[in-house]
UniProtKB/Swiss-Prot annotation:
Lineage: Eukaryota, Metazoa, Chordata, Craniata, Vertebrata
Main location: cytoplasm
Protein family membership: Belongs to the MIF4GD family.
Organism: Mus musculus
Pfam family, one: MIF4G
Protein name listed in UniProt: MIF4G domain-containing protein
Span of domain MIF4G: 3-205
Domain of life from the UniProt record: Eukaryota
Subunit (UniProt): Interacts with EIF4G1, EIF4G2 and SLBP; probably tethered by SLBP to the 3'-end of mRNAs ending with the histone stem-loop, it also interacts with EIF4G1 which is bound to their 5'-end.
Alphabetically ordered keywords of this record: Cytoplasm, Nucleus, Translation regulation
Subcellular location: Cytoplasm; Nucleus
Reported function: Functions in replication-dependent translation of histone mRNAs which differ from other eukaryotic mRNAs in that they do not end with a poly-A tail but a stem-loop. May participate in circularizing those mRNAs specifically enhancing their translation.
Gene3D superfamilies the UniProt entry points to: 1.25.40.180
Gene expressing this chain: Mif4gd
């Protein structure tokens, strides 16, 4: 993969002015309003789930560029403040826009995956990420394939890191997931398969065995 394609950050869906703003933030962060940049990235992440999967990488790059250029963290502070605001309003978001809710969970997990303090995940994000995943593991969420898919994808991405930060909450989360799998609910056959795969994935030390991969992914393709 070329350097250009690796660093495009999926910003083609922005208008030309915003693309230029983001490119400048990446190269010369002191030349732009970084709080505005943080809001632009969060706003777009709530609308575009493809971008929300890439946004953490872009945010990390801007944070690194700002730190190197000025030794400051204006962008990170603005980003975390906005994440907190959306976290506080997460129930309203889920009620009015399922897509927006799934994009938000994808985004906050992506940020948790990329942002580091002293080479460790940010403690401030651990409980908010867990709270979002707990909501996805509630019975009414498990009846929606979009939310089950999001739960499983995010646990694949950050589950192992989260467990290292707070193993007790991961145990509690998997009690909910097992109950959802075992108790009579409105689970689709695909959702049931995804939950079983996730239960076995964690039991295997957050790894998919070759046999499990062959079984589950042949089932999904069928």
């Amino acid at each position: 993969m070329s350097e250009a394609s690796r660093d495009d950050y999926k910003i083609q869906s922005f208008d030309a002015e915003t693309q230029q703003l983001l490119k400048t933030a990446l190269k010369d962060p002191g030349a732009v309003d970084l709080e505005r940049v943080a809001n632009v990235i969060v706003d777009h992440s709530l609308q575009d789930c493809v971008f929300s999967k890439e946004a953490g990488r872009m945010c990390y790059a801007i944070i690194q560029a700002e730190s190197k250029q000025a030794g400051q963290s204006v962008f990170r502070r603005g980003l975390l403040n906005r994440l907190q605001k959306e976290y506080d309003a997460r129930e309203q978001l889920r009620a009015c826009s399922l897509q927006g809710w799934v994009c938000y969970v994808t985004f906050i997990c992506n940020i948790f995956d990329y942002l580091r303090v002293n080479n460790m995940p940010m403690m401030a994000l651990v409980n908010p990420v867990y709270d979002c995943l707990f909501q996805l593991a509630q019975p009414e969420s498990l009846s929606r394939e979009e939310e089950v898919d999001c739960l499983v994808l995010q646990l694949h991405r950050v589950g192992e890191q989260l467990e290292k930060m707070n193993g007790q909450r991961m145990d509690e989360l998997f009690i909910l997931i097992r109950d959802g799998f075992l108790l009579p609910t409105d689970l689709s056959s695909l959702a049931r398969l995804l939950l079983l795969e996730m239960i076995e994935f964690r039991a295997a030390g957050w790894k998919t065995t070759p046999a499990a991969h062959k079984y589950y992914y042949s089932e999904v393709s069928d």
